[in-house]
Amino acid sequence: MRFSVVTVIILGMLLRFPAAASDILTQKVDQIFSVYDKPGSPGCSLGVIRDGNFVYRKAYGLATLELGVPLSPQSVFYMGSVSKQFTAASLVLAAEQGYLSLDDDVRKYIPELPDYGHVVTLREMIHQTSGFRDFYTLLGLSGHDPADFNSPEETFKIVVRQRGLNNIPGDEWIYSNTNYFLLGIVVKRATKKSLAEFAAENIFTPLGMSHTLFYDDHTVVVASRVAAYDSGPHDSFHVDWSTTFELVGAGGLMSTVDDLLLWDGNFYANRLGKGTLVQELQTPGVLNNGNKISYAMGLDLGNYRGLPIVEHGGALFGYRTELLRFPEQKFSVICLCNIASAVPENLARKVADIYLSDKLQPGASALNPPSNESFPDPATFAGKYLDRRTHLMYSFTASNGNLMAWGAVLIRINANQFYDLGSDVITFEPSKGVIHAKLDLKGETYFSGSRVEELHLGEPVLASYTGQFQSTELGTVYSLSVEKGTLTLRNGGNPPQDLTPIAKDEFDAGDLGRLVFERDSGGRVLGFRVFTQDARGVGFKKED
Protein backbone atom coordinates (compact mmCIF):
# COMPACT_ATOMS: atom_id res chain seq x y z
CA MET A 1 0.00 0.00 0.00
CA ARG A 2 1.31 3.39 -0.95
CA PHE A 3 0.92 6.54 1.17
CA SER A 4 1.19 10.05 -0.19
CA VAL A 5 3.54 12.47 1.51
CA VAL A 6 0.53 14.42 2.82
CA THR A 7 -0.99 11.25 4.31
CA VAL A 8 2.24 10.40 6.06
CA ILE A 9 2.48 13.91 7.50
CA ILE A 10 -1.11 13.79 8.74
CA LEU A 11 -0.60 10.38 10.34
CA GLY A 12 2.52 11.64 12.03
CA MET A 13 0.68 14.64 13.40
CA LEU A 14 -2.14 12.45 14.74
CA LEU A 15 0.32 10.17 16.46
CA ARG A 16 2.01 13.13 18.09
CA PHE A 17 -1.16 14.86 19.29
CA PRO A 18 -1.90 12.48 22.21
CA ALA A 19 1.66 12.81 23.45
CA ALA A 20 1.54 16.57 23.06
CA ALA A 21 -1.75 16.76 24.96
CA SER A 22 -0.29 14.58 27.70
CA ASP A 23 2.75 16.83 27.91
CA ILE A 24 0.52 19.85 28.41
CA LEU A 25 -1.29 18.12 31.29
CA THR A 26 1.89 17.02 33.01
CA GLN A 27 3.42 20.47 32.64
CA LYS A 28 0.40 21.90 34.45
CA VAL A 29 0.79 19.30 37.21
CA ASP A 30 4.49 20.06 37.54
CA GLN A 31 3.63 23.72 37.98
CA ILE A 32 1.40 22.86 40.96
CA PHE A 33 4.32 21.13 42.69
CA SER A 34 7.05 23.51 41.52
CA VAL A 35 7.41 24.99 45.02
CA TYR A 36 8.89 21.66 46.14
CA ASP A 37 10.93 20.92 43.03
CA LYS A 38 14.06 22.75 44.10
CA PRO A 39 17.36 21.93 45.81
CA GLY A 40 17.28 21.33 49.55
CA SER A 41 13.49 21.08 49.91
CA PRO A 42 11.19 18.34 51.19
CA GLY A 43 8.29 17.66 48.88
CA CYS A 44 5.70 15.24 47.60
CA SER A 45 5.38 11.97 45.73
CA LEU A 46 2.48 11.89 43.28
CA GLY A 47 0.52 9.21 41.47
CA VAL A 48 -2.28 9.94 38.99
CA ILE A 49 -4.37 6.88 38.13
CA ARG A 50 -6.87 6.26 35.36
CA ASP A 51 -8.48 2.89 34.65
CA GLY A 52 -6.11 1.09 37.00
CA ASN A 53 -2.86 2.45 35.59
CA PHE A 54 -0.65 5.44 36.24
CA VAL A 55 -1.06 8.19 33.70
CA TYR A 56 1.52 10.22 35.60
CA ARG A 57 3.78 9.49 38.53
CA LYS A 58 6.51 11.77 39.74
CA ALA A 59 8.25 12.91 42.90
CA TYR A 60 9.29 16.43 43.83
CA GLY A 61 11.85 17.27 46.50
CA LEU A 62 13.96 15.22 48.89
CA ALA A 63 13.19 12.20 51.06
CA THR A 64 15.92 13.18 53.53
CA LEU A 65 17.51 16.60 53.63
CA GLU A 66 20.43 15.27 55.65
CA LEU A 67 21.51 12.80 52.95
CA GLY A 68 20.13 14.60 49.91
CA VAL A 69 18.19 11.52 48.79
CA PRO A 70 15.43 12.42 46.32
CA LEU A 71 11.84 11.30 46.74
CA SER A 72 10.49 8.68 44.35
CA PRO A 73 7.25 6.70 43.81
CA GLN A 74 8.93 3.93 45.83
CA SER A 75 9.63 6.17 48.84
CA VAL A 76 7.97 4.86 52.02
CA PHE A 77 5.82 7.47 53.80
CA TYR A 78 4.12 7.44 57.17
CA MET A 79 0.47 7.59 56.12
CA GLY A 80 -1.27 9.00 59.20
CA SER A 81 -5.06 8.58 59.18
CA VAL A 82 -5.07 7.05 55.69
CA SER A 83 -4.29 3.98 57.83
CA LYS A 84 -7.88 3.87 59.07
CA GLN A 85 -9.31 2.33 55.90
CA PHE A 86 -6.83 -0.54 56.23
CA THR A 87 -7.75 -1.06 59.88
CA ALA A 88 -11.42 -1.08 58.89
CA ALA A 89 -10.69 -3.58 56.12
CA SER A 90 -8.95 -5.82 58.67
CA LEU A 91 -12.08 -5.73 60.87
CA VAL A 92 -14.34 -6.63 57.94
CA LEU A 93 -12.08 -9.51 56.90
CA ALA A 94 -11.80 -10.74 60.49
CA ALA A 95 -15.60 -10.74 60.68
CA GLU A 96 -15.80 -12.72 57.43
CA GLN A 97 -13.47 -15.30 58.95
CA GLY A 98 -15.67 -15.65 62.04
CA TYR A 99 -13.36 -14.04 64.57
CA LEU A 100 -15.84 -11.30 65.48
CA SER A 101 -19.02 -9.50 64.52
CA LEU A 102 -19.03 -5.80 63.71
CA ASP A 103 -22.08 -5.48 65.96
CA ASP A 104 -20.26 -6.90 68.99
CA ASP A 105 -19.89 -4.83 72.17
CA VAL A 106 -16.29 -3.59 72.25
CA ARG A 107 -16.10 -4.64 75.92
CA LYS A 108 -16.31 -8.26 74.75
CA TYR A 109 -12.71 -7.81 73.59
CA ILE A 110 -11.59 -4.96 75.84
CA PRO A 111 -13.22 -5.54 79.25
CA GLU A 112 -10.87 -2.97 80.77
CA LEU A 113 -13.16 -0.27 79.39
CA PRO A 114 -15.71 0.96 81.96
CA ASP A 115 -19.46 0.51 81.64
CA TYR A 116 -20.67 3.78 80.12
CA GLY A 117 -24.34 2.91 80.53
CA HIS A 118 -24.58 2.29 76.78
CA VAL A 119 -23.22 -0.49 74.60
CA VAL A 120 -20.55 0.67 72.14
CA THR A 121 -20.32 -1.56 69.07
CA LEU A 122 -17.37 -2.11 66.76
CA ARG A 123 -19.48 -0.81 63.88
CA GLU A 124 -20.11 2.48 65.71
CA MET A 125 -16.38 2.80 66.30
CA ILE A 126 -15.61 2.19 62.62
CA HIS A 127 -18.10 4.89 61.60
CA GLN A 128 -16.85 7.33 64.28
CA THR A 129 -20.19 7.50 66.12
CA SER A 130 -19.13 5.71 69.32
CA GLY A 131 -18.54 8.76 71.50
CA PHE A 132 -15.02 7.81 72.60
CA ARG A 133 -12.90 10.84 73.45
CA ASP A 134 -9.88 11.34 71.20
CA PHE A 135 -6.70 10.09 72.85
CA TYR A 136 -4.48 12.70 71.20
CA THR A 137 -6.62 15.43 72.74
CA LEU A 138 -6.62 13.67 76.11
CA LEU A 139 -2.83 13.42 76.05
CA GLY A 140 -2.60 17.12 75.22
CA LEU A 141 -4.97 18.01 78.07
CA SER A 142 -2.88 15.91 80.45
CA GLY A 143 0.20 17.98 79.65
CA HIS A 144 1.95 15.71 77.15
CA ASP A 145 2.93 16.60 73.62
CA PRO A 146 0.61 14.11 71.90
CA ALA A 147 2.71 13.93 68.72
CA ASP A 148 5.69 12.69 70.71
CA PHE A 149 3.79 10.25 72.90
CA ASN A 150 4.87 6.84 71.64
CA SER A 151 3.72 4.23 74.17
CA PRO A 152 0.68 2.07 73.27
CA GLU A 153 0.51 0.96 76.91
CA GLU A 154 0.32 4.49 78.32
CA THR A 155 -2.13 5.53 75.62
CA PHE A 156 -4.35 2.58 76.54
CA LYS A 157 -4.24 3.57 80.21
CA ILE A 158 -5.52 7.08 79.59
CA VAL A 159 -8.31 5.75 77.34
CA VAL A 160 -9.66 3.26 79.91
CA ARG A 161 -9.53 5.92 82.66
CA GLN A 162 -12.26 7.90 80.91
CA ARG A 163 -15.60 7.73 82.69
CA GLY A 164 -17.70 9.47 80.07
CA LEU A 165 -18.38 9.59 76.34
CA ASN A 166 -18.75 12.54 74.01
CA ASN A 167 -22.25 11.42 73.03
CA ILE A 168 -24.69 8.54 73.28
CA PRO A 169 -23.26 5.90 70.90
CA GLY A 170 -24.83 6.29 67.48
CA ASP A 171 -26.32 9.72 68.15
CA GLU A 172 -23.56 11.85 66.60
CA TRP A 173 -20.54 11.66 64.32
CA ILE A 174 -17.41 12.88 66.13
CA TYR A 175 -14.03 11.97 64.66
CA SER A 176 -11.87 10.26 67.26
CA ASN A 177 -8.55 8.45 66.86
CA THR A 178 -9.41 6.39 69.94
CA ASN A 179 -11.90 4.37 67.88
CA TYR A 180 -9.28 3.01 65.52
CA PHE A 181 -6.58 2.66 68.17
CA LEU A 182 -8.94 0.36 70.08
CA LEU A 183 -10.02 -1.45 66.90
CA GLY A 184 -6.39 -2.39 66.32
CA ILE A 185 -6.39 -3.98 69.78
CA VAL A 186 -9.66 -5.78 68.99
CA VAL A 187 -8.08 -7.36 65.89
CA LYS A 188 -5.17 -8.62 67.98
CA ARG A 189 -7.32 -10.05 70.77
CA ALA A 190 -9.90 -11.62 68.44
CA THR A 191 -7.54 -13.16 65.87
CA LYS A 192 -4.51 -13.77 68.13
CA LYS A 193 -2.47 -11.90 65.53
CA SER A 194 -1.28 -8.32 65.72
CA LEU A 195 -2.89 -5.83 63.37
CA ALA A 196 0.43 -5.71 61.50
CA GLU A 197 0.43 -9.49 61.05
CA PHE A 198 -3.24 -9.79 60.14
CA ALA A 199 -3.14 -6.95 57.59
CA ALA A 200 0.03 -8.34 56.02
CA GLU A 201 -1.49 -11.80 55.60
CA ASN A 202 -4.93 -10.69 54.46
CA ILE A 203 -4.33 -7.42 52.57
CA PHE A 204 -0.76 -6.47 51.75
CA THR A 205 0.62 -9.84 50.62
CA PRO A 206 -2.43 -10.87 48.52
CA LEU A 207 -2.35 -7.52 46.71
CA GLY A 208 1.43 -7.51 46.26
CA MET A 209 1.93 -4.41 48.41
CA SER A 210 5.48 -5.42 49.28
CA HIS A 211 6.52 -2.07 50.77
CA THR A 212 3.46 -1.53 52.98
CA LEU A 213 3.23 -2.36 56.69
CA PHE A 214 1.75 -1.34 60.01
CA TYR A 215 4.75 -0.03 61.93
CA ASP A 216 4.22 -1.39 65.45
CA ASP A 217 7.89 -2.02 66.29
CA HIS A 218 10.11 1.05 66.13
CA THR A 219 13.28 -1.09 66.02
CA VAL A 220 12.41 -2.45 62.56
CA VAL A 221 14.47 -1.02 59.69
CA VAL A 222 12.27 0.20 56.82
CA ALA A 223 14.14 0.58 53.54
CA SER A 224 13.50 3.83 51.61
CA ARG A 225 11.79 5.38 54.63
CA VAL A 226 11.06 9.09 54.28
CA ALA A 227 11.93 11.68 56.94
CA ALA A 228 9.58 14.62 57.58
CA TYR A 229 10.07 18.32 58.19
CA ASP A 230 8.40 21.59 59.08
CA SER A 231 9.19 25.04 57.79
CA GLY A 232 11.53 27.34 59.70
CA PRO A 233 12.54 30.98 59.32
CA HIS A 234 14.27 32.29 56.21
CA ASP A 235 13.31 29.33 53.99
CA SER A 236 14.85 26.84 56.40
CA PHE A 237 13.46 23.52 57.64
CA HIS A 238 13.57 21.59 60.88
CA VAL A 239 13.08 17.90 61.62
CA ASP A 240 9.48 16.90 62.41
CA TRP A 241 9.23 13.14 62.75
CA SER A 242 9.80 10.34 65.26
CA THR A 243 11.85 7.17 65.04
CA THR A 244 10.12 5.63 68.08
CA PHE A 245 6.43 6.13 67.30
CA GLU A 246 4.63 2.78 67.13
CA LEU A 247 0.91 3.39 67.72
CA VAL A 248 -1.17 1.58 65.08
CA GLY A 249 -4.83 1.36 64.15
CA ALA A 250 -5.65 5.05 63.99
CA GLY A 251 -2.37 5.52 62.13
CA GLY A 252 0.89 3.63 61.84
CA LEU A 253 0.65 2.54 58.21
CA MET A 254 3.68 3.00 55.97
CA SER A 255 3.31 2.77 52.21
CA THR A 256 4.36 4.06 48.80
CA VAL A 257 2.69 5.59 45.76
CA ASP A 258 3.38 2.41 43.80
CA ASP A 259 1.83 0.14 46.45
CA LEU A 260 -1.23 2.34 46.81
CA LEU A 261 -1.94 1.88 43.10
CA LEU A 262 -2.65 -1.77 43.96
CA TRP A 263 -4.94 -0.83 46.84
CA ASP A 264 -6.81 1.63 44.63
CA GLY A 265 -7.27 -1.02 41.97
CA ASN A 266 -8.86 -3.38 44.48
CA PHE A 267 -11.84 -1.02 44.78
CA TYR A 268 -12.77 -1.91 41.18
CA ALA A 269 -11.87 -5.63 41.19
CA ASN A 270 -11.82 -6.94 44.75
CA ARG A 271 -9.36 -9.76 45.40
CA LEU A 272 -9.72 -9.90 49.18
CA GLY A 273 -12.04 -11.98 51.33
CA LYS A 274 -15.44 -13.20 50.18
CA GLY A 275 -16.24 -10.39 47.79
CA THR A 276 -18.18 -7.84 49.85
CA LEU A 277 -15.22 -5.92 51.31
CA VAL A 278 -15.29 -2.97 48.91
CA GLN A 279 -19.05 -2.51 49.27
CA GLU A 280 -18.83 -2.58 53.06
CA LEU A 281 -15.91 -0.16 53.22
CA GLN A 282 -17.87 2.38 51.18
CA THR A 283 -21.22 1.99 52.97
CA PRO A 284 -22.07 5.14 54.96
CA GLY A 285 -22.74 4.95 58.66
CA VAL A 286 -26.27 5.36 60.01
CA LEU A 287 -27.17 7.32 63.14
CA ASN A 288 -29.74 6.25 65.71
CA ASN A 289 -32.26 8.61 64.09
CA GLY A 290 -31.90 6.76 60.78
CA ASN A 291 -29.93 9.49 59.03
CA LYS A 292 -26.99 8.42 56.89
CA ILE A 293 -23.66 10.15 57.42
CA SER A 294 -20.98 10.69 54.78
CA TYR A 295 -18.33 8.76 56.71
CA ALA A 296 -18.04 5.12 55.74
CA MET A 297 -15.33 2.76 57.05
CA GLY A 298 -12.22 4.90 57.30
CA LEU A 299 -13.35 6.69 54.15
CA ASP A 300 -15.03 10.04 53.54
CA LEU A 301 -17.82 10.01 50.97
CA GLY A 302 -18.41 13.34 49.30
CA ASN A 303 -18.80 15.37 46.16
CA TYR A 304 -16.34 17.60 44.35
CA ARG A 305 -17.58 19.95 41.64
CA GLY A 306 -20.50 17.69 40.81
CA LEU A 307 -18.69 14.34 40.92
CA PRO A 308 -18.84 11.73 43.71
CA ILE A 309 -15.54 11.21 45.53
CA VAL A 310 -14.15 8.78 48.10
CA GLU A 311 -11.17 10.02 50.06
CA HIS A 312 -9.22 10.21 53.28
CA GLY A 313 -6.21 12.22 54.35
CA GLY A 314 -3.57 11.85 57.02
CA ALA A 315 -1.39 14.16 59.10
CA LEU A 316 1.09 13.50 61.89
CA PHE A 317 4.49 15.05 62.53
CA GLY A 318 5.50 16.59 59.19
CA TYR A 319 3.78 13.93 57.08
CA ARG A 320 0.75 14.93 55.00
CA THR A 321 -1.09 12.39 52.83
CA GLU A 322 -4.20 12.10 50.68
CA LEU A 323 -5.92 9.37 48.65
CA LEU A 324 -8.63 10.89 46.44
CA ARG A 325 -10.82 8.67 44.24
CA PHE A 326 -13.45 9.55 41.62
CA PRO A 327 -15.12 6.11 41.37
CA GLU A 328 -17.38 6.85 38.40
CA GLN A 329 -14.43 8.09 36.33
CA LYS A 330 -12.06 5.38 37.65
CA PHE A 331 -9.67 8.21 38.36
CA SER A 332 -7.57 8.67 41.51
CA VAL A 333 -4.83 10.91 42.86
CA ILE A 334 -2.29 9.78 45.46
CA CYS A 335 -0.38 12.64 47.06
CA LEU A 336 2.16 11.91 49.81
CA CYS A 337 4.22 14.76 51.29
CA ASN A 338 6.96 15.09 53.91
CA ILE A 339 6.56 18.77 54.73
CA ALA A 340 4.01 19.96 57.31
CA SER A 341 3.00 23.03 55.31
CA ALA A 342 1.74 20.92 52.39
CA VAL A 343 -2.02 20.47 52.01
CA PRO A 344 -2.34 17.35 49.83
CA GLU A 345 -6.16 17.51 49.88
CA ASN A 346 -5.89 20.77 47.93
CA LEU A 347 -3.02 19.56 45.76
CA ALA A 348 -4.90 16.39 44.78
CA ARG A 349 -7.98 18.40 43.82
CA LYS A 350 -5.89 20.74 41.69
CA VAL A 351 -4.52 17.71 39.84
CA ALA A 352 -8.06 16.41 39.35
CA ASP A 353 -9.06 19.83 38.00
CA ILE A 354 -6.51 19.35 35.22
CA TYR A 355 -7.35 15.78 34.21
CA LEU A 356 -11.13 15.96 34.69
CA SER A 357 -11.66 19.49 33.38
CA ASP A 358 -14.27 18.29 30.87
CA LYS A 359 -16.31 16.50 33.54
CA LEU A 360 -16.17 18.80 36.56
CA GLN A 361 -18.81 21.44 37.08
CA PRO A 362 -17.69 25.06 37.39
CA GLY A 363 -17.37 26.07 41.01
CA ALA A 364 -16.74 29.22 42.97
CA SER A 365 -13.29 29.51 44.43
CA ALA A 366 -11.68 31.72 47.02
CA LEU A 367 -10.13 33.67 44.14
CA ASN A 368 -13.32 33.78 42.09
CA PRO A 369 -16.33 34.05 44.42
CA PRO A 370 -19.86 34.64 43.15
CA SER A 371 -20.22 38.34 42.49
CA ASN A 372 -23.15 40.17 44.01
CA GLU A 373 -22.87 43.67 45.36
CA SER A 374 -25.84 43.05 47.67
CA PHE A 375 -23.96 40.38 49.63
CA PRO A 376 -23.04 41.46 53.17
CA ASP A 377 -19.42 42.30 53.82
CA PRO A 378 -17.72 39.12 55.16
CA ALA A 379 -16.57 41.19 58.14
CA THR A 380 -20.22 41.19 59.21
CA PHE A 381 -19.82 37.56 60.26
CA ALA A 382 -16.41 37.81 61.96
CA GLY A 383 -16.22 36.91 65.63
CA LYS A 384 -16.42 34.02 68.10
CA TYR A 385 -19.45 31.72 68.09
CA LEU A 386 -20.35 29.44 71.02
CA ASP A 387 -22.54 26.33 70.91
CA ARG A 388 -24.22 26.22 74.33
CA ARG A 389 -24.96 22.48 74.08
CA THR A 390 -21.52 21.14 73.17
CA HIS A 391 -19.49 24.17 74.36
CA LEU A 392 -17.66 24.16 71.03
CA MET A 393 -16.47 27.56 69.87
CA TYR A 394 -15.40 28.64 66.41
CA SER A 395 -13.67 31.87 65.45
CA PHE A 396 -14.10 33.59 62.08
CA THR A 397 -11.96 36.51 60.93
CA ALA A 398 -12.12 38.85 57.94
CA SER A 399 -9.06 39.55 55.80
CA ASN A 400 -8.75 41.26 52.40
CA GLY A 401 -12.46 40.90 51.70
CA ASN A 402 -12.55 37.20 52.64
CA LEU A 403 -13.92 35.30 55.61
CA MET A 404 -11.38 32.96 57.19
CA ALA A 405 -11.48 30.03 59.62
CA TRP A 406 -9.05 27.29 60.59
CA GLY A 407 -6.28 29.26 58.88
CA ALA A 408 -7.95 29.05 55.47
CA VAL A 409 -10.08 31.27 53.25
CA LEU A 410 -13.73 30.19 53.18
CA ILE A 411 -15.38 30.02 49.77
CA ARG A 412 -18.60 31.98 49.44
CA ILE A 413 -21.70 30.14 48.21
CA ASN A 414 -24.26 32.93 48.55
CA ALA A 415 -25.08 35.87 50.80
CA ASN A 416 -24.94 33.97 54.10
CA GLN A 417 -23.25 30.64 53.30
CA PHE A 418 -19.61 29.63 52.98
CA TYR A 419 -17.70 26.37 52.75
CA ASP A 420 -14.17 25.07 53.01
CA LEU A 421 -12.47 22.34 50.99
CA GLY A 422 -13.45 19.82 53.64
CA SER A 423 -17.02 20.34 52.37
CA ASP A 424 -18.11 21.88 55.67
CA VAL A 425 -20.96 24.31 54.97
CA ILE A 426 -21.26 27.28 57.33
CA THR A 427 -24.52 29.22 57.40
CA PHE A 428 -24.86 32.58 59.16
CA GLU A 429 -28.36 33.62 60.26
CA PRO A 430 -28.88 37.14 61.65
CA SER A 431 -31.86 37.27 64.01
CA LYS A 432 -32.99 40.02 66.38
CA GLY A 433 -29.60 41.67 66.45
CA VAL A 434 -27.72 38.40 67.09
CA ILE A 435 -25.88 36.39 64.44
CA HIS A 436 -26.13 32.61 64.64
CA ALA A 437 -23.73 30.23 62.88
CA LYS A 438 -24.51 26.67 61.86
CA LEU A 439 -21.96 24.18 60.55
CA ASP A 440 -23.17 21.10 58.66
CA LEU A 441 -20.77 18.18 58.58
CA LYS A 442 -21.26 14.61 57.33
CA GLY A 443 -24.89 15.39 56.56
CA GLU A 444 -25.71 16.54 60.10
CA THR A 445 -25.68 19.83 62.00
CA TYR A 446 -22.39 19.59 63.85
CA PHE A 447 -22.33 23.07 65.37
CA SER A 448 -25.02 25.62 66.12
CA GLY A 449 -23.99 28.69 68.07
CA SER A 450 -24.39 32.41 68.56
CA ARG A 451 -21.76 35.10 68.40
CA VAL A 452 -20.45 35.98 71.83
CA GLU A 453 -18.60 38.97 73.15
CA GLU A 454 -15.79 38.83 75.68
CA LEU A 455 -16.95 39.42 79.24
CA HIS A 456 -15.04 41.62 81.64
CA LEU A 457 -14.83 40.27 85.19
CA GLY A 458 -13.15 42.00 88.09
CA GLU A 459 -10.42 40.36 90.15
CA PRO A 460 -12.74 39.56 93.11
CA VAL A 461 -14.99 37.54 90.79
CA LEU A 462 -12.04 35.86 89.06
CA ALA A 463 -10.63 34.90 92.46
CA SER A 464 -13.62 32.62 93.07
CA TYR A 465 -12.36 30.37 90.27
CA THR A 466 -8.82 29.95 91.61
CA GLY A 467 -7.31 26.87 93.24
CA GLN A 468 -5.92 23.43 92.46
CA PHE A 469 -8.11 21.17 90.33
CA GLN A 470 -7.42 17.46 89.85
CA SER A 471 -8.58 15.13 87.08
CA THR A 472 -8.50 11.40 87.75
CA GLU A 473 -9.42 10.82 84.10
CA LEU A 474 -6.27 12.59 82.92
CA GLY A 475 -4.02 11.97 85.90
CA THR A 476 -3.07 15.63 86.11
CA VAL A 477 -3.62 18.82 88.13
CA TYR A 478 -4.49 22.28 86.81
CA SER A 479 -3.58 25.32 88.90
CA LEU A 480 -5.72 28.44 88.40
CA SER A 481 -4.66 31.85 89.68
CA VAL A 482 -5.29 35.51 88.93
CA GLU A 483 -2.27 37.16 87.33
CA LYS A 484 -2.37 40.82 86.25
CA GLY A 485 -6.15 40.84 86.22
CA THR A 486 -6.45 37.64 84.17
CA LEU A 487 -7.41 34.11 85.23
CA THR A 488 -4.43 31.95 84.27
CA LEU A 489 -4.10 28.16 84.02
CA ARG A 490 -0.86 26.29 84.68
CA ASN A 491 -0.19 22.59 84.17
CA GLY A 492 3.26 21.32 85.10
CA GLY A 493 6.04 22.81 83.02
CA ASN A 494 3.80 23.81 80.14
CA PRO A 495 3.40 27.49 79.19
CA PRO A 496 0.65 29.29 81.15
CA GLN A 497 -2.72 29.68 79.43
CA ASP A 498 -4.82 32.81 79.93
CA LEU A 499 -8.54 32.15 80.29
CA THR A 500 -11.09 34.44 78.65
CA PRO A 501 -14.61 34.64 80.11
CA ILE A 502 -17.22 34.08 77.39
CA ALA A 503 -20.38 33.20 79.36
CA LYS A 504 -21.52 32.69 82.94
CA ASP A 505 -19.04 30.26 84.57
CA GLU A 506 -17.48 29.51 81.17
CA PHE A 507 -13.99 30.42 79.94
CA ASP A 508 -12.18 29.99 76.66
CA ALA A 509 -8.80 28.30 77.19
CA GLY A 510 -7.51 28.45 73.63
CA ASP A 511 -6.16 25.11 72.44
CA LEU A 512 -7.24 23.52 75.73
CA GLY A 513 -10.90 24.11 74.89
CA ARG A 514 -13.58 25.58 77.13
CA LEU A 515 -13.75 25.32 80.92
CA VAL A 516 -17.29 25.14 82.33
CA PHE A 517 -17.37 25.54 86.11
CA GLU A 518 -19.76 23.69 88.41
CA ARG A 519 -21.06 25.06 91.71
CA ASP A 520 -22.97 23.68 94.68
CA SER A 521 -26.32 25.06 95.82
CA GLY A 522 -24.51 27.71 97.84
CA GLY A 523 -22.60 28.99 94.83
CA ARG A 524 -19.22 27.52 95.82
CA VAL A 525 -17.06 26.29 92.92
CA LEU A 526 -16.73 22.49 93.06
CA GLY A 527 -14.77 21.96 89.87
CA PHE A 528 -15.09 22.27 86.12
CA ARG A 529 -15.38 20.25 82.96
CA VAL A 530 -13.25 20.70 79.85
CA PHE A 531 -14.92 20.62 76.45
CA THR A 532 -13.00 20.32 73.18
CA GLN A 533 -14.08 19.35 69.69
CA ASP A 534 -13.40 15.65 70.30
CA ALA A 535 -13.20 15.32 74.10
CA ARG A 536 -16.28 16.60 75.87
CA GLY A 537 -16.88 16.90 79.59
CA VAL A 538 -13.52 15.80 81.02
CA GLY A 539 -13.90 16.32 84.76
CA PHE A 540 -11.73 18.25 87.23
CA LYS A 541 -12.50 18.43 90.97
CA LYS A 542 -11.32 21.26 93.19
CA GLU A 543 -8.90 20.13 95.86
CA ASP A 544 -9.66 21.19 99.44
Please report, for each region that a protein language model flagged, where it lies by residue.
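Bacterial N-terminal signal peptides
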Residues: 6-16
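Short, well-ordered beta-strand elements
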Residues: 311, 322-339, 435-439, 526-530
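Short, conserved catalytic-motif segment at the N-terminal edge
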Residues: 22-79, 99-104, 157-164, 237
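Active-site SXXK
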Residues: 33, 46, 52, 76-103, ...
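Short, surface-exposed loop or secondary-structure junction motifs
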Residues: 64, 117-327
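Peripheral terminal and inter-domain segments
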Residues: 19-21, 349-544
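Structured C-terminal helix/loop/strand segments within mature extracytoplasmic catalytic/sensor domains
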Residues: 317-361
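Short, small/polar residue-rich loop motifs at catalytic or cofactor-binding pockets
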Residues: 40-43, 317-320, 390, 474, ...
